[in-house]
Design a protein with these regions (language model features):
Chain B
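Short helix-capping/turn signature of helix-turn-helix
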Residues: 32-35, 44, 142-149
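A short, charge-rich alpha-helical start-of-domain segment used by transcription regulators
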Residues: 16-39, 128
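Helix-turn-helix DNA-binding module
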Residues: 128-139, 147-164
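C-terminal edge and immediately downstream basic/flexible tail or linker adjoining helix-turn-helix-like DNA-binding
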Residues: 1-5, 17, 156-162, 173-193
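Arg/Lys-rich amphipathic alpha helix in sigma70-family domain 2
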Residues: 64-71, 82-101, 119
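Sigma70-family region 2
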Residues: 19-20, 46, 57-74, 94-96
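Internal acidic/polar
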Residues: 7-11, 97-123, 150, 190
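Structural recognition of an alpha-helix C-terminal capping motif at a helix-to-coil junction
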Residues: 39, 53-60, 74-86
């Protein structure tokens, strides 16, 4: 730097002092506008969030009775699927066919076999 | 919280209180910060109406950022000086692009200097000289010699090194000295050297 800070300031300091003493001041109207802005922003940020509309699945969930009912339904559904896909071997193994076949009209069967219409 | 109790609180604490819904904290911050913001904006712009617009916008941004403010992050004033400078630079760039011819010539103070206080005339003369400086030089000189900030804080505001701050202020002051040297007698500048 060609000049020292002291040299630079020898004449400028009186101007800087004058500038500090004659600072531009905000008008009353500006202060009021800024205050109003603050209130508007505060009202925006502190407003409670609007309740969101529940989705269809959550409405159905509540309609069914919440988690206890849904758990029961899910268990029953899984049991049904399991019974449907597994072969009923235990029920048939070694059983006599006549034990579970019921002839509701034996006379009709006889008539058919005899060919007597 | 009572308004009087806020006098001792830092700007950062008041901003957090405002974010938590304390209206008195907003009033305290408005009274404390708006005059500083306005003074700084005017020194950077040299236009009262524009300085008011910039001040309102800077304060609005402060209210909006309050919920995200982290107390350990930065000083509120450092943040505000940076926002004000950016807004002023944007405004001056836009004005320069629109109509240079429409900017009025600085008034010749020689005819009126005797009628007004010498101190006010000096402030006005300095403002005219500041208006002629490049944006960054003006900002550095104002922050250092009128706002009275230390170079490290100015470096933080301007996002440059302290060496760059020193260089900007030195060049700015040389330009101011040259601009004001022709008005020594008129402004009583020579009497106090």
């Amino acid at each position: 730097m060609a000049m020292s800070d002291r040299d630079d300031m020898s004449g400028l300091e009186v101007f800087f002092d004058a500038a500090r003493a004659h600072a531009a001041e905000p008008s009353v109207a500006l202060m009021a506008r800024i205050e109003a802005d603050a209130q508007a922003v505060a009202a925006q940020t502190s407003a409670p969030p609007r309740p969101r509309r529940a989705s269809l699945s959550s409405q159905l969930y509540r309609l069914l009775g919440g988690w206890p009912a849904v758990t029961g339904l899910a268990t029953a559904a899984m049991a049904g699927v399991w019974l449907g896909i597994s072969l009923p071997e235990g029920m048939l193994d070694g059983a006599n066919e006549s034990a579970y076949l019921i002839d509701v009209a034996p006379e009709l069967a006889f008539d058919l076999a005899g060919g007597n219409f | 919280m009572p308004f009087d109790a806020m006098a001792e609180m830092s700007d950062e604490t008041l901003l957090v209180l405002f974010a938590n819904g304390d209206g008195a904290a907003a009033r305290a911050l408005n009274l404390r910060l708006t005059p500083r913001v306005m003074g700084h904006a005017y020194r950077l712009l040299g236009n009262h109406a524009e300085a008011e617009d910039v001040t309102q916008e800077a304060m609005l941004r402060l209210w909006k950022i309050a919920p995200e403010w982290r107390q350990d992050e930065a000083k509120v004033t450092t943040w505000l000086y940076r926002v004000v400078a950016n807004l002023c630079i944007d405004l001056r760039r836009r004005a320069r692009g629109v109509a240079l011819e429409s900017i009025p010539e600085p008034e010749d103070g020689r005819a009126t200097a005797a009628e007004i206080l010498q101190d006010a005339a000096r402030a006005e003369a300095l403002q005219e000289a500041l208006d002629q400086l490049p944006d960054r030089q003006r900002q550095a000189v104002v922050l250092r010699h009128i706002e009275g900030l230390a170079n490290p804080e100015i470096a933080e505001i301007m996002e440059i090194t302290t060496e760059a701050v020193e260089s900007l202020t030195a060049r700015g002051k040389r330009a101011l000295t040259a601009a004001l040297s022709g008005r020594q007698e008129e402004l009583g500048y020579g009497d106090e050297r």
